[in-house]
């Protein structure tokens, strides 16, 4: 599957005239509790051409591929990524700490080195608490609940605990 994902990422680069700087797995596979029917949640950061950044027209800052049963692929432009870092976006911190990396350039390591300067415990706690509450409402209110769905509530609660005790972004 890794070869197929890498091939799809190369196609994205070619079709969109971008360069992928980092591509990782996000979701249950990266969290370590994938089920046999889990899809691949591939997330990436990309850079457009220099000319694109000099345009006065708005250029879309997200690339999303249609979701199928096996693959869910989307990415953010590096400019959007920088804005999200400034806002201490917890999802961004997760992507850069994913244990499953499909593509990586030297940019990724340089970016990791500055991320902690922008980490906000408060924003992280709000994010994970909101995620736990939303997942609880969506997944645990039914009569029959799959065991995996409990992890979708437990993981953000444990992330909050990590942030409160370690004062750092939680590991993926």
In which residue ranges do the predicted regions lie?
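Helical scaffold of the NTase/Pol beta-like nucleotidyltransferase catalytic core
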Residues: 1-24
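Beta-sheet entry/capping signal
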Residues: 19-22, 41, 161
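Short His-Asn-centered micro-motif
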Residues: 26-27, 74
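Catalytic metal-binding acidic patch
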Residues: 27-68
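Short loop/turn segments at secondary-structure transitions that flank enzyme active sites
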Residues: 48-51, 88-91, 134, 159-160
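A basic- and aromatic-enriched beta-loop-alpha substructure that forms the phosphate/nucleotide-
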Residues: 55-131
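Conserved nucleotidyltransferase catalytic core and NTase-mimicking acidic/glycine-rich helix/loop elements
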Residues: 112-172
